[in-house]
Amino acid sequence: MTLRDYWLNPRKYMEITRLAVPLLLSNAGLVFMQFADAMFLAKYSPDAIAASGMGGMVSWMVSSLFVGIVGYTSVITANNIGAHQEDKVGCVNWQGIYLALLAGVLTVLLGFLTAPFFRLVGHAPEIQALESEYLRVLLFGNVVFFVQASLGGYFSGRGDNVRLMAAQMSGQALNVVLDYALIFGKWGLPEMGVTGAALATVLSGLLPIAIMLAYFLRCDARERYHTHHWRLHWGIMARLLRFGVASGIQMWIDAALWTLFLVIIGRLGTVELAATSIAFRLNSLAFMPIIGLARGMGTLAGQRHGAREFQEVVAYICHCLVMSEIWMISIAATYALLPEWYFRMFSADGSRGTVDFAEVLATGKTLLRFVAVYCLGDACNIALSIGLHSVGDTRWTSIMMSIVTLILVAVLLYAGYAHWGLYPIWTAATVFILALPPIWIFRLRQGNWKAIRVATD
C-alpha cells in the first residue's frame, strides 16, 4: 500500500463517516444530555454539580469494568462478520446479556456502601450526603447500562448504527425531560435535586433497551444472525471474557485514575471540585465525537481483521486519526479563546449551596485551557486504543495502561500528601495524557496484534 492509501484515501474517509455519523449524532445527544443534566444541577446549586461530578465518576469507575466486558460483544461481532460466521452473532450477544445481569446484581450490593465510602473520601459533610445519594441510585440501576452495552454490540458490530442511534437518542431525549421534572419538582413530581438527576438517568435507559430488543428479536435477525440462540455457550462466554476482561480492566483503570483525581481535587475545596467537574463535562464535548468516529472505525477494522486484511486495519486507524485531530484542534481553539463563555452556561440561580459561582468561574477559566492542551493528545489515545481493541490486542494495552497509570497515581498521592495546589495537579494529569500516544503507536507498528484471532471458532 502507498502512503496515500494509508492516510489520504477518500473512500476510507467516506466509509468511516458513513458508520460514524449515526454514532456521532448519538454521542452528540449524549453530550447534550450530560450538558442539560449538569446545567440543571448547576442552576439547582453549586453543591449539586460538585456532588454529581464525583458521584458520576465513582459510578463509572465501578461500572466500567463490566461495560468493557459486555461491550466487547461489538468487537467479536465485527470479527465474526469479517470471518463469515454470521450464525454466531446472536449467541455472542446473549452471553453478554447474561454477564450484564450478573454484573447488575453485584453493583446493587455495592450501592449499600456509598455512605461509608464517601465518609472515607473526606469531602465536606454537605457534599458527602449529596454524593452518596447520587451514587446509590446509579449503582442500583447500573444493570440498565450493562444490558444496553451488550445489545449495542449487536448493532455496532454489524455496522447497523442508524438503529442504534435511534434507540440511544430516544433515551437521551427522555432523560432531559425527566431531569427537569425530577430535579426541580415539575409537573406534580417531587423536587429531588441530585437524586432526581440520577433517577432520571436510570429510568430513561429502559427505553433504548426496549427498542433494541425489538430489532434484535425480529424474524429476519433470527434467521440471519440466529438471535434466538439464547442458551449459555461456555466456549463463546470464555472468548468474551478472555478479551473483554482485559478491555474492562483498562477502562476501569482509566475510571479509577480520574476518580482518584477528583477525590484529591475535592479535598482542596468545593470551589475546586465544582470547577473541575464542569471542566470534565465540557471535556466530553471534545472527546464524545471522537469516540463516535473511533467506534465507526473500530467496526471496519474489526471486520478487516476478521478477514485477515491487516494493511486495511492500519489504514482505517490512520484515517480515523486524521479526522480526530481535525476535530480536536477546532474545539481546543474555542476552549482556549472562550473559556468564560463555556463556563457561564453553568451559572447558578438562587442562593442554594455553599460557594459563589463567581469563584468557580474564575478557577474554571484556567482549567479549560488545560483541557485545550491535553485534548489534542486525547484524540490520539482514543483513536489508537480503540483501533488496537478492535483487533483483540486488549491484554498488552491493559498492562501498559496499568504501568503508566501507576506512575500518575504515585504523583497524585504525593500531591495530596504534599498539599499541592490545583494547577500543579492538573499539570501532572495533562503530561500523563500527552505521554500515551507514543505507546499506542509503537504497539501498532510492532504488529503483534496480527497473530490474534478474535472471531469465534
Regions found by a protein language model. Give the residues of each.
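Short runs within selected transmembrane alpha-helices of multi-pass transporters and secretion channels
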Residues: 70, 74, 138-156, 164-172, ...
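Short alpha-helical transmembrane segments in multi-pass integral membrane proteins
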Residues: 1-20, 77-143, 189-245, 301-373, ...
